[in-house]
Amino acid sequence: MEMDLNNRLTEDETLEQAYDIFLELAADNLDPADIILFNLQFEERGGAELFDPSEEWQEHVDFDLNPDFFAEVVIGLADTEDGEINNIFARVLLCREKNHKLCHILWRE
C-alpha cells in the first residue's frame, strides 16, 4: 500500500472524521443506556483525542501501523470538564492518507 505524506488528513480532519463515523455507528454498537449517557454528558465532559495507534491494534489488524499514516482517536467522557478521557466509548483506528479509506473501531463492551 503506497501512501503519500502530502495527501493526509489534518489532525482536525482526522478527529472530525472519526467522530462522524462514531455517531453514525454508535446506535448499532453501544447499549442504549450508554448512548443516552454519552449524549447527555458529551457537551460538558465529552471529547475525542488523537493518538498514535496503540500496540493493542496489532491484535486486530495485519498491517504496519505507521504513525505517519494511521491515527487512533479515543472518544468518550472525562470525570471533569478539562480532565482526561477515562470513560471510553470507542477507539477508532483511521488511515489519514486520503486515498486509503480505512477504519476499524473497538467499541465499549
From Swiss-Prot:
Pfam families: DUF440
S-S bonds: none
Secretion signal, residue range per the UniProt entry: none
Gene3D superfamilies reported in the protein's UniProt record: dsDNA mimic, putative
Known role: May act as a double-stranded DNA (dsDNA) mimic. Probably regulates the activity of a dsDNA-binding protein.
Family recorded in the similarity comment: Belongs to the putative dsDNA mimic protein family.
Protein name: Putative double-stranded DNA mimic protein YciU
